[in-house]
A protein has these predicted regions:
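Short loop/helix-cap segments at secondary-structure boundaries that form the rim of catalytic
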Residues: 35-43
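NAD(P)-cofactor binding segment of oxidoreductase domains
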Residues: 67, 77-105
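Residues at the starts of beta-strands that form the adenosine-phosphate
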Residues: 3, 26-28, 103-104
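Conserved glycine-rich Rossmann-like NAD(P)H-binding loop of the short-chain dehydrogenase/reductase
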Residues: 24-35
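Conserved Rossmann-fold NAD(P)-dependent oxidoreductase catalytic core, especially the SDR/UDP-sugar
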Residues: 92-124
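SDR active-site strand-loop-helix element
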Residues: 7, 31, 67-71, 105-111
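N-terminal Rossmann NAD(P)H-binding glycine-rich loop of SDR-like oxidoreductase domains
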Residues: 4-24
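NAD(P)H-binding glycine-rich loop region in Rossmannoid oxidoreductase-like domains
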Residues: 44, 49-85, 114-116
């Protein structure tokens, strides 16, 4: 595989998988909204991008063979703070992959699919 794109590269899962994913492709393009993701591995390139920006996602996914989409906000937040990255952002990744002719997308479903207890339930 020539080009693999990873979204959410600064997150918990993305940061753990960056190094192993470099072994699957000639080029790993790691992306996140964070300014920095630390030291890059051999074969890895970092592109700071907002999932909610369709034009940015189209550019990042250009010529990609595969996308591993882990980018999202996983904290308890008001809906409007989640809308851009979690809903619009996921749509943009799928739409960009379709436009680029990407044949494989790996997607980790939201933790909210099974419900998320309020943080207050664990405090006190």
């Amino acid at each position: 595989m020539k080009k693999l794109v990873l979204t959410g590269a600064a997150g918990r899962l993305g940061s753990y998988l960056r190094e192993p994913l470099t072994k699957l492709a000639d080029e790993l393009v790691s992306t996140d909204i964070a300014e920095d993701i630390g030291t890059l591995y051999a074969g890895e390139r970092y592109v700071q991008a907002d999932l909610a920006d369709l034009a940015a996602m189209i550019e990042v996914l250009k010529d990609a063979d595969m996308v591993v989409h882990f980018g999202a906000i996983v904290d308890e937040k008001p809906f409007m703070e989640l809308l851009g990255p979690n809903f619009v952002g996921s749509y943009n990744v799928w739409e960009s992959a379709y436009q680029a002719g990407v044949r494989r997308v790996v997607y980790a479903s939201s933790i909210h699919a099974v419900g998320m207890p309020k943080k207050a339930d664990f405090i006190g």
